[in-house]
Amino acid sequence: MAEAFVSFGLEKLWDLLSRESERLQGIDGQLDGLKRQLRSLQSLLKDADAKKHGSDRVRNFLEDVKDLVFDAEDIIESYVLNKLSGKGKGVKKHVRRLACFLTDRHKVASDIEGITKRISEVIGEMQSFGIQQIIDGGRSLSLQERQRVQREIRQTYPDSSESDLVGVEQSVKELVGHLVENDVHQVVSIAGMGGIGKTTLARQVFHHDLVRRHFDGFAWVCVSQQFTQKHVWQRILQELQPHDGDILQMDEYALQRKLFQLLEAGRYLVVLDDVWKKEDWDVIKAVFPRKRGWKMLLTSRNEGVGIHADPTCLTFRASILNPEESWKLCERIVFPRRDETEVRLDEEMEAMGKEMVTHCGGLPLAVKALGGLLANKHTVPEWKRVFDNIGSQIVGGSWLDDNSLNSVYRILSLSYEDLPTHLKHCFLNLAHFPEDSEISTYSLFYYWAAEGIYDGSTIEDSGEYYLEELVRRNLVIADDNYLSWQSKYCQMHDMMREVCLSKAKEENFLQIIIDPTCTSTINAQSPSRSRRLSIHSGKAFHILGHKNKTKVRSLIVPRFEEDYWIRSASVFHNLTLLRVLDLSWVKFEGGKLPCSIGGLIHLRYLSLYEAKVSHLPSTMRNLKLLLYLNLRVDTEEPIHVPNVLKEMIQLRYLSLPLKMDDKTKLELGDLVNLEYLYGFSTQHSSVTDLLRMTKLRYLAVSLSERCNFETLSSSLRELRNLETLNFLFSLETYMVDYMGEFVLDHFIHLKQLGLAVRMSKIPDQHQFPPHLVHLFLIYCGMEEDPMPILEKLLHLKSVRLARKAFLGSRMVCSKGGFPQLCVIEISKESELEEWIVEEGSMPCLRTLTIDDCKKLKELPDGLKYITSLKELKIEGMKREWKEKLVPGGEDYYKVQHIPDVQFINCDQ
């Protein structure tokens, strides 16, 4: 494994030497010596990796080599960047720069000679230890080849989670009965060891038709080991009242009071997933009233937690799979599309498969991991290698003993070991994040790009390929929400995260700092070896000034409840080799981002999302290698953005502040590599800057009075790759009617469109992009019913009308309209009184949300014809609505076929 990481580092170093050969002239002799030693080193790596398991000495050799490769890359890249920066004009500046250049060249030559000598010494030690040269004639797949293979694999992998459901049908039925038919038990607990399928079982119960009909509202909160009282209460309230914008501003007392009153008055189901200790319940129990009506489904590895929460708790013990069920689940993963008519699996492979699943201890997680491991192996010899590996390195046993846990861990580890090097690197990056984190896939893709895992292709595409492969192998769980208005996230199962942490420690990949006063880190024994930091405590920022952190390449601060403050202006002085810096939600003393940020010339990734920053320094112009820059800071006053972004020509992702001061003028025309641009303002930039951004796939733009829709539209004509276009709300756009200027039919790739601009009438359907899938209309002020036009957009799958998008009183969805629509949301349309849905309209509709439309008299009668409808959310409507639509109500016939009907805040 270490050999793979060293080889990966060497490959990047060779690429750097080749790419910058012209700028490295003058130190050719030193570079030739370095290259000779690197070739010798490369030939020793295979044998070294084969012998590392039996020798600490060999492991140390490999760690030394990895450090040397990193050091060489840092030295060479620093030299190139310093040579590129500060092209001064005038004789004096030229002379001064020439002197600095000669000094730098002398220093880099000396440094390279030092690295070469150290490599030579390590090679000598390795050879004296008996490590042999192995010339590897193979080659790794190129990025394009890997993507092609992944596309082929992906075609044969199931899109549905139904493959997980083996042996749980009776358990689901039993649990549903206890929740909807039995009033004796306030709390129902699912208990069992990690990986046994508690969460999968709870999720099936949570979404069951009978459960959805029985309760008025639902909340699902993952508690996990690290949580705060306030965070759990916020999450429950957000689930029960998703459109309440005041929740995040409430203190603990206000949260407790509101939740208590809500649960006391209604019939709600609350799922607390992954509660570890009895004491955890004591921290959060104050919001749950004694009055019955609400119920709780709780999952825990500790049976005592449920009984501690409620002495009358019904404890359901999740059971392991028997051998037949284990093999059935494994088959579903390995052969997702096979049916009974197809040729049977080779008898020898089937026999090996059934033997291998016995080592999984009946745990679904381990079975799925094994299935993912076998899914891309199609021959008897390939299966035999996996079979031998499992059989020789683990010992089977009963599912309760330590041998079985070791067996399960080994199964999960094998899935990791089977990954190609680039995916190992991707996987270990997930160790940065705390347990149960929802990890933004967008951020993750750019982390990977900043690490140099891929380049040359669109970053989002490459990231999607790699993430899908990790999901396919059951190493990562993806949020498969087809509503693209919502952020995409991925997560890790607890046990898989333990594997990730263990491997990260083994490879000295990462140091996690939880408390600077103790050694609770992944790599406490040798912190100087780790070049990545993840800070999980606001108290730990002071360690960034330590000299042993000077080689750190990545610093990520995941979001926690506590505040993170950076108070020192010199905080970045010792971090000059950083490639990744994520300071989202961090607060800066005086609101100033330190000028020392300009010294981080190696940065590829910088996020200040929701950071408390009111001043950005002009020294940011030095960050010429940035691929990702997020400046959506948390500031009440408009912020000044210096006109230095134009020099960051490598940028692929740029998110600008929503409030910029009048003095901000940004020249962005040279950012031709951008794929994602949020917050582009025609007040602060010229619309012609967009003409050259032909790689853009996502654009969110704010219009000003001096730029009309027609002008903008003509500037966007060259953006043929644009997939998402959002027009952001501003007071200026609300004062102008853009109806006559709307023309977007030339955007043939556009899938998502958001319009927060005033239009008295919806444009004709021929003016919309021809393949539009998702449409969001807000603050449009339309006076005519938009439905006759929208229902003719044949590819639409989701429509959302919000906050006075429509000012009329009557809407009609006619027969045959919206042939592919799956989701519709009508929110805060204060003038809407009547909505008619004709039979034959919206035949594919699955989810309908009506929120705070106070004048709407009743639910459309035509909903009774939409048999595809699975979920109906009624929120913020009058009590009469709920009384009419519950069983026995006069309008119940309209919704009796809908499995999941939710009433949220409908008690007024």
From Swiss-Prot:
Annotated LRR repeats reside at 575-600, 601-623, 648-673, 693-718, 722-746, 748-770, 793-820, 842-867, 882-905
Impact noted for substituting W399C = In strain: cv. Di-17 and cv. Landsberg erecta
Alphabetized InterPro entries for the sequence: Apaf_helical, LRR_dom_sf, LRR_R13L4/SHOC2-like, NB-ARC, P-loop_NTPase, RX-like_CC, Rx_N, WH-like_DNA-bd_sf
Result, substituting P819T: In strain: cv. Landsberg erecta
What mutagenesis or variant effect is reported for R267K?
A: In strain: cv. Landsberg erecta
Q: Which domain of life is it from?
A: Eukaryota
Which GO BP terms, alphabetically? cellular response to salicylic acid stimulus; defense response; defense response to virus; plant-type hypersensitive response; positive regulation of defense response to virus by host; response to absence of light; response to blue light; response to light stimulus
Tell me the impact of changing R692H: In strain: cv. Landsberg erecta
Q: What is the effect of changing G138V?
A: In strain: cv. Landsberg erecta
What outcome is documented for mutating Q650E in this protein? In strain: cv. Di-17
Where does it live in the cell?
A: Cell membrane
Per its record, what triggers expression of this gene product?
By salicylic acid (SA). Induced by Hyaloperonospora arabidopsidis, benzothiadiazole (BTH) and wounding. Degraded in darkness and in blue-light.
Q: Which Gene3D superfamilies match?
A: 1.20.5.4130, Helical domain of apoptotic protease-activating factors (1.10.8.430), P-loop containing nucleotide triphosphate hydrolases (3.40.50.300), Ribonuclease Inhibitor (3.80.10.10), Winged helix-like DNA-binding domain superfamily/Winged helix DNA-binding domain (1.10.10.10)
Q: A single Gene Ontology molecular function, please?
A: nucleotide binding
Which tissues and organs express this gene's product? Mostly expressed in leaves, and, to a lower extent, in roots.
Query: Where does the sequence pass through the membrane?
Result: none
Any one cellular-component term (Gene Ontology): plastid
- How does this chain assemble? Interacts with the NAC protein TIP. Interacts with MORC1/CRT1. Interacts with COP1 and is subsequently degraded in a 26s proteasome dependent manner.
Family the entry assigns: Belongs to the disease resistance NB-LRR family. RPP8/HRT subfamily.
Q: Which PANTHER family match?
A: DISEASE RESISTANCE PROTEIN RGA3 (PTHR36766:SF40), PLANT BROAD-SPECTRUM MILDEW RESISTANCE PROTEIN RPW8 (PTHR36766)
Function in brief? Disease resistance protein. Resistance proteins guard the plant against pathogens that contain an appropriate avirulence protein via an indirect interaction with this avirulence protein. That triggers a defense system including the hypersensitive response, which restricts the pathogen growth. The interaction with TIP (TCV-interacting protein) may be essential for the recognition of the avirulence proteins, and the triggering of the defense response. Triggers resistance to turnip crinkle virus (TCV) via a SAG101-dependent pathway.
* Record-given protein name: Disease resistance protein RPP8
